[in-house]
Amino acid sequence: MNSLLSLEHISKGFPGVRALNDISFELQSGEIHALLGENGAGKSTLMKILCGVYKQDAGRILIDGAPVDFRHYHDATDAGVGVIFQEFSLIPYLNAVENIFLGRELRNALGMLRKKDMRAQAEKICQRLDVNIDLDAPVDHLSVAEQQFVEIAKALSLDARILVLDEPTATLTPNEAEHLFRVMRELKAQGVGMVFISHHMEEIYEICDRITVLRDGEKIGDREVGEVAVDELLEMMVGRKISNSFPEKTPLRNDGDIVIDARAIQLHKNGPVNSFQVRKGEILGFAGLVGSGRTETALAMIGALPACRKEVSVEGEPAAMKTPAEALRRGIGLLPESRKKEGLILPFSIRENITLNNLAKVSGAASVIDRKRESEVAETLSAKVRVKAPDCETPVGNLSGGNQQKVVIARWLNNDCKVLIFDEPTRGIDVGAKTEIYRLMKQLTAQGVSIIMISSELPEVVGVSDRVAVFRQGSIVKILEGDAVNSNEIMRYATGGVKDE
């Protein structure tokens, strides 16, 4: 294989932070190279330097052995670098062809769009990827996997020979992820070099050739995939051995106070009617395949989605909860699946995000915010959940995924919530940060807070939950507890391998 990309002795600093220190990284033609590290290790900064978003303070970039100087994102794309970020750059109301050629549309001598030519090129790229996409539909009508293939097609239309894929399977089903891997293998055979960023070790071992590990802005080492064990990689990432990321479970008490009694939640007329209870200080897991109705049931309970029938009591009192605001007044908070879009205001500081839902708590006469009091509350709560940041004035958009999730938790602690709904709480979060989130959840339940945890990661559901409600096709088919909370039992019920008793 030929050396396609070399990053040599790259360093980058921000005010008060040394983000990268003397990092070197090499990508071969036709290689899939994993870039591993905890959130905050420097992966995103390094890739933003590669794609021209940031300019390095020291070091150089070489493509095909020749030095390049990227002062802008377009410089990188012109040099054959394509990046598929976690947050897609697609315009939702435009179709796939329009998105692929956005900003560089093909036109004739009169300035008219050459739509047939653009469509023909788009079809050719899709054939190269071996994907079948409705090129005429607005991209927001496509599945997440199809949108991702549009992003890849967009990069390939620019003759990208270097692709960076940042957590590409985070929102994909297993079948969609396998389809993506087939596409990646095809591109690999065509000589495209790929940088693959993922926190899922099984994916690294399935698709990658080589691994480079970063920690705290330093390169810890690189390894061939077939020559390194998972435990060694984890130790390289976090700087210590990880024996078990899940906290020890305490014996389940069946006599605990019932905080939520959902006697009936029906999303659609003639649809299934679900019922469940949540006890004080327990973690109730919602498990099931993607599209099984887990999130929809939780959102309907708190009024974020409509329900044609809802009978719910909170601490023994009937609760209509027609809106999330009413649910919040009842002491129920939601940590949404998409924390960046729905859980946080990224340009706002840590302080502003923590106090946003309860400004009355930090306001004085005439409802004027007491900045000193606000800062004290934010600092106390951020310390409690161990947010890693220079100070509470740091914009949350500058934080790692794990620290962003901690800010969302701190916000709900500021509201003294009795029940927290965690929707995919560790999605896009590294191993070390996951352990901290689990520790926080355990601390909250020890203080009497009840948690509903919706997760697509079976080890997480099994390792954290006291009881598990298993969903299939919109219906809770079984509630497991004790020794029955294991991966085999959950999958048997989730896939229809057994009937509910």
Curated annotation (Swiss-Prot):
What keywords are assigned to this protein?
A: ATP-binding, Cell inner membrane, Cell membrane, Membrane, Nucleotide-binding, Repeat, Sugar transport, Translocase, Transport
GO cellular component terms attached to this protein's record: plasma membrane
Residue limits of the ABC transporter domain?
5-241, 252-498
Q: What is its main location?
A: membrane
Query: Pfam family example for this protein?
Result: ABC_tran
Q: Which reaction does it catalyse?
A: D-ribose(out) + ATP + H2O = D-ribose(in) + ADP + phosphate + H(+)
Q: Which residues bind ATP?
A: G37, E38, N39, G40, A41, G42, K43, S44
Q: What class of enzyme is it?
A: translocase
What this chain does, per the record? Part of the ABC transporter complex RbsABC involved in ribose import. Responsible for energy coupling to the transport system.
This protein is called Ribose import ATP-binding protein RbsA
UniProt lists the gene as rbsA
